[in-house]
A protein has these predicted regions:
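A residue-level marker of the well-folded mature domains of exported/periplasmic proteins
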Residues: 1-138
Length: 138
């Protein structure tokens, strides 16, 4: 909840954190409120482009996005084509199911070597050169 997000963020800030990645829906709103109240720190949003969907855009470096629209589109297209299956859908960089939002207000503040490295890692993941595995994958 928002209160937990605010409390946890205040704890992280007191421990020297300067970037917070809240992962749990409304917790991010509490994080934004805490960052705003403290006048320091930034955050990385989750699920959607928080810059566009919250009041804390000026605090959001980027967002780790679930591109649910891609999954919905693919499912509808499979149904129309008669190829729909009940196999679990896993959103990946390759199938457009996940991604990073733009840096928006932080565009000029993120060092170019970091931007380049992130792009390089994304390309390596998509090509299969860098394999990311999870024991929780379906």
């Amino acid at each position: 909840n928002q209160s937990n997000g605010q409390n946890l963020t205040n704890t992280f800030l007191s421990q020297g954190a300067d970037v917070i990645l809240p992962v749990a829906g409304p917790v991010g709103l509490g994080t934004g409120a805490a960052l705003e109240a403290n006048g320091s720190g930034t955050m990385i949003w989750v699920d959607s482009d928080g810059y566009l969907t919250t009041d804390y855009g000026s605090l959001i470096i980027t967002s780790v996005m679930k591109e649910i629209g891609a999954a919905v589109f693919d499912s509808i297209q499979e149904q129309v084509n008669g190829s729909f299956s009940n196999e679990p859908y896993v959103g990946t960089l390759e199938n457009g199911g996940v991604g990073l939002a733009e840096f928006h207000d932080f565009e000029g503040q993120v060092p170019q070597d970091v931007v380049d490295r992130v792009a390089e890692l994304q390309e390596q993941i998509i090509s299969g050169e860098l394999v990311i595995e999870s024991p929780n994958a379906p």
